[in-house]
Amino acid sequence: MRRLRRQRPFLQSILKEANQKKRQKMLTHANADQINAVSEMVLNLLKKRVPIKPKTFDKLKRHKTVLREVGRRRNSLKRRREYLLKQTGRGFWSGLEDCFKACCVR
């Protein structure tokens, strides 16, 4: 959770970015700490440490394989970044944004 607090501005900017190309550019140039912060948030989501609404859960249900791969710490940084770059739809990112809001409220 400390990593989430340190990388809060980056996470907010990347989750709120509506333009796909800008978001991909931000992810491409993100450093290891920033990618690890996204990975940690996803891991907390998968371990059910973050209470999320059923609506958010339904948004993210379609992306369960990607979430598992991003949350898996055994995967290299490059591989986790590639999985995040492949996500082009808004459902994945808006679901993670709702998850981030739930993390910050706690």
Where are these regions (language model features)?
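Terminal export/targeting leaders at protein ends
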Residues: 1-84
